Structures are given as structure tokens and as C-alpha cells.
Amino acid sequence: NISQFGWVNALLILGVLISLIVPLAYVLRGKTEDHSAGRQQAETLLQILNRARQHSGYLYLTAGFFVCGFHVMFVMAHLPTFLKSHDMPPWLFGTAISLIGITNLIGTFTFGYLGDKYSKKYLLSTLYFLRSIVISIFLIFPVSVTSVLVFCFLIGFLWLATVPLTNALVGQLFGLKYLATLAGIVFCSHQLGSFASILLG
């Protein structure tokens, strides 16, 4: 850990581990079958980017992921300070973030599974709607240890469950050939939302 090795050595170790992704990706590569239309298969990157720019569904996904990033980082960055301002016990700060992380795993797998069974766009819409309800209720009612734990459990369940649904929808709209590029642009919007939440918070 950082306290044992120092931050410089910790970053070097992290860099070495991340660099292993390149040879592993080469070994694990395979031909991906793309069942999208033949017209999509023949499109160049510039053509697909131009089509994505004009596609309302893709623009909605990008805007939604901006809001997702805003939600996620706003809670992560400002929840401890919010709890402190309400005189919550110090142990609750770390417990709250940990609970979000644990339930995030459950929620992501759950919505990923449901995305194979039901309409992804309706699941994603429901997820964003539930987030707004959970956050609103938490802010309306008095803050207590119980309300914080319930909030963290629920918001954690909805935390990054948007990711498998959003990426799958991008793949459905444009095929798999340029999925990494198009999903990366959507994710960039997520990061901009995260930045905005820190800046405005």
C-alpha cells in the first residue's frame, strides 16, 4: 500500500500492472461477430461518428451519462462533508462509502442481467428515475444514521448499473465495430459530469 511503499513507488507499481493489459489484450483477442447491418459494417470511423452526432438516441445516452457522472462524483466527494455538517459519527463516513461500493457490485450485475431479458432503454430510464427519487427523499427527510445507511444501500445499487446498459445500447445502435470509440465518447461525458459536480459543489 501507499503508506508502505510511498506514493511514487505505488504509482510505478500501478503503471507496470496496467502495462500488462497490452500483451494480455493481444493474447486474448479474437474475431468478434457483429450482427449489425451490412451498411454499418462498411462505414468508416468518420461516417459512424457523423451518424452518431445526428442520432437522438446517442445524444440522449451521452447527456444521461453526464448526469450519471454528476450524481456519482457529487455523492462521493460531498457526502462525508454533508454527514459531518449534520454531526454524524465519524465511523459512518467510511461505512457509507463502503456500503455504496458493495451494493454497486450487486446492482451492476443485476441490471446487466436484466438488460439481457428486458428493454435496455426502459431499464436505463427507470434507473435514472429511481436515482432522482432516492436522492430527493434523502434530502427531504431528517438525516440520521439509519437514513444514511438506507440511502447508501439504495444509491449504491443504482450507482454504476448504468454502465452495462449504456454500452449495450450503444452497441445496439451502431454495431460492435466502433463500440469502443463511441462508448468512450459517452464515457468522456460521464467524466465531464464528474468534473462539473466537483467544480459546482
Short names for language-model regions:
Residues N1-F5, L83-K84, L114-G115, L200-G201:
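Interfacial helix-cap and linker-helix signal at transmembrane-aqueous boundaries
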Residues R53-Y113, V163, S197:
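Extracytoplasmic gate region of multi-pass secondary transporters
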Residues N1-E33:
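Helix-loop-helix hairpin linking two adjacent transmembrane segments in secondary transporters
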Residues I100-N104, T108-L169:
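C-terminal transmembrane helical hairpin of 12-TM major facilitator-type secondary transporters
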Residues M88-I97, S144, V148, L179, ...:
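Juxtamembrane helix-start elements in MFS-like secondary transporters
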Residues L160, L173-G201:
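A late C-terminal transmembrane helix in Major Facilitator Superfamily
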Residues F66, S98-I102, F129, G184-L192:
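Transmembrane alpha-helical cores of Major Facilitator Superfamily
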